[in-house]
């Protein structure tokens, strides 16, 4: 692969309903086989459910949930002298957002509600309150980093 220059990041256009870039990115994370309209229907359906259940602004619930799920540190494998160490490293802001969105999607998929919109609404509400599958995943990653703090001097 050529190493001439860094590939520029593409700008994501804000979503049509709320004009929010993070919501548009989340739709792209949810999208399967390029079916954006299906992803939009799921996200907007989940937002309607949030408004019904919680009576709060869905955008606020979404942003609080995303911020709660964002990891601060994670572990990376590093080989030193024939042994692999799990080295805790700080997570870049762009990766934080990407991981949070991915974890929310996966946690929502594993839930038992009927439709994906309902599952997503439930997961976003729980994450905004500091519980749920995505929060469990974040806490697990933080625990791993805490447990391997002794190897933090092997920084990359």
Curated annotation (Swiss-Prot):
Keywords annotated in UniProt: Ribonucleoprotein, Ribosomal protein, RNA-binding, rRNA-binding, tRNA-binding
Signal sequence coordinates: none
Superkingdom of the source species: Bacteria
Gene Ontology cellular-component annotations: small ribosomal subunit
Gene Ontology biological process terms in this record: translation
Role noted for this protein: One of the primary rRNA binding proteins, it binds directly to 16S rRNA where it nucleates assembly of the head domain of the 30S subunit. Is located at the subunit interface close to the decoding center, probably blocks exit of the E-site tRNA.
Record HAMAP family: Ribosomal_uS7_B (MF_00480_B)
Name by which UniProt lists this protein: Small ribosomal subunit protein uS7
């Amino acid at each position: 692969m050529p190493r001439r220059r860094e590939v520029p990041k593409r700008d994501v256009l804000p979503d049509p309903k709320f004009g929010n870039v993070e919501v548009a990115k989340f739709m792209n994370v949810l999208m399967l086989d390029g079916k954006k309209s299906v992803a939009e229907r799921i996200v907007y359906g989940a937002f309607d459910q949030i408004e019904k259940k919680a009576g709060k602004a869905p955008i606020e619930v979404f942003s609080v949930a995303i911020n709660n799920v964002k990891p601060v540190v994670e572990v990376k494998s590093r080989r030193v002298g024939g042994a692999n160490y799990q080295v805790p490293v700080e997570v870049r802001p762009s990766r934080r957002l990407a991981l949070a969105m991915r974890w929310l999607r996966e946690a929502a998929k594993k839930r038992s509600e009927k439709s994906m919109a309902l599952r997503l609404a439930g997961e976003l509400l729980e994450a905004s309150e500091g519980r749920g599958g995505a929060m469990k995943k974040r806490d697990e990653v933080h625990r791993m980093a805490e447990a391997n703090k002794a190897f933090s001097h092997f920084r990359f």
